[in-house]
């Protein structure tokens, strides 16, 4: 059966945002500021996946905090389990939760790798043939986050990129440390 055209209709766009940097650079605070504004504008709540157990600080008022001294209001899931995160975020009700924050995606990628229980190579690395099974649940979560109607903010650790010029490694850039 051939594909058919349907009348285009406006729909609410959902932000998909990545935020990365070194430890202590303000990723969690920035994510909460964005999430709070998005949730307030959309009339919903924030679902915050916390793999670092660092959001409790932001769930209380801190008068000394110059920017946003009052407590943030969000629902938290404390885990580093990729399976738990996938199950929890795919069961969220978009009518209630308008924003999902994953902090940190780096831990979830590491959990996917750590879940590998097969035999390692002679060099003590995961064999090439095993990577498909390792990546599948991680990619499934990422696909859901990209396709879901909710705003999504993903925090991750910074990874430095080096090139070796004349035997001397030189930093040439940074990326988010995830798959």
Language model region names:
Residues 102-133:
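Conserved P-loop NTPase nucleotide-binding/switch module
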Residues 76, 123-139, 179:
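A short acidic, glycine-rich active-site loop
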Residues 56-58, 108-118, 161-165:
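Short acidic/His/Gly/Ser-rich catalytic and metal-binding motifs that mark active-site loops
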Residues 20-24, 143-179:
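Phosphate-binding/switch region of NTP-binding enzymes
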Residues 103, 141-142:
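The first long alpha-helix at the start of the GST-like C-terminal all-alpha domain
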Residues 2-101, 106-111:
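Conserved P-loop
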Residues 65-66, 116-120, 170-171:
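Glycine-rich, phosphate-binding/catalytic loops in enzymes
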């Amino acid at each position: 059966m051939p594909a058919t055209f349907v009348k285009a209709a406006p729909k609410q766009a959902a932000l998909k945002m990545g935020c990365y940097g070194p430890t202590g650079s303000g990723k969690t605070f920035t994510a909460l500021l964005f999430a709070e504004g998005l949730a307030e504008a959309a009339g919903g709540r924030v679902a915050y996946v916390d793999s670092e157990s660092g959001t409790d600080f932001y769930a209380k008022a801190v008068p000394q905090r110059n920017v946003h001294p009052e407590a943030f209001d969000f629902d938290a899931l404390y885990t580093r389990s990729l399976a738990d995160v996938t199950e929890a975020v795919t069961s969220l009700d978009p009518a209630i939760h308008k924003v999902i924050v994953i902090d940190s995606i780096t831990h979830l990628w590491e959990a996917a790798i750590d879940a590998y229980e097969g035999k390692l190579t002679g060099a003590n690395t995961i064999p090439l043939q095993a990577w498909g099974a390792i990546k599948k649940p991680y990619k499934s979560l990422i696909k859901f986050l990209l396709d879901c109607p909710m705003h999504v903010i993903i925090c991750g650790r910074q990874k430095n990129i080096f090139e070796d010029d004349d035997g001397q490694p030189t930093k040439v850039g940074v990326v988010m440390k995830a798959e």
